[in-house]
A protein has these predicted regions:
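Metal-dependent enolase-superfamily TIM-barrel catalytic cores that perform enediolate-based chemistry
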Residues: 1-77
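Shared catalytic-loop signature of beta/alpha-barrel
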Residues: 48, 54, 65-82, 87-132
Length: 132
């Protein structure tokens, strides 16, 4: 189950996640997408709270251009961090590989500019052992 968060207060997000966790089967996979909704200064503290729900991954917690913050989050949080809006081009994929600001990448054909660019992004990140 993928949950979009980061548009409400942290308390409201936590309440929503608690309600969802109460009704999901124990073996359900929870994926949390912040859609760049967290302020970098609060992200690690917020995501440590969210880790209580054992998400499979946390997607794009901060703004796409906050790659230094993404790197700090990736090092500080046990849950894998998935880059989405941070990687639209092969150059951004190379930057991800060099700086390791996420544990995996979400590749979308439309955002990448088509199949060829998406394959290039997958090749770059895959060669570095980052799942797509």
């Amino acid at each position: 189950f993928k949950v979009k968060t980061g548009f409400s207060t942290h308390a409201e997000d936590m309440s929503r996640l608690e309600r969802l966790a109460a009704i999901l089967p124990a073996d359900a996979s929870l994926r949390i997408d912040y859609n760049q909704g967290l302020a970098a200064v609060d992200a690690i503290r917020t995501l440590r709270d969210v880790e209580a729900f054992r998400p499979a991954f946390i997607e794009q917690p901060v703004a796409r251009d906050r790659r230094d913050a993404m790197a700090e989050i990736t090092r500080a949080i046990d849950t894998p961090i998935l880059a989405d809006e941070s990687v639209f081009t092969p150059q951004e994929a190379a930057d991800l590989v060099a700086r390791r600001y996420a544990d995996a990448v979400s590749i979308k054909l439309m955002k990448a500019g088509g199949f060829t660019a998406a394959r290039t992004i997958a090749a770059i990140t895959g060669a570095a052992g980052l799942p797509a």
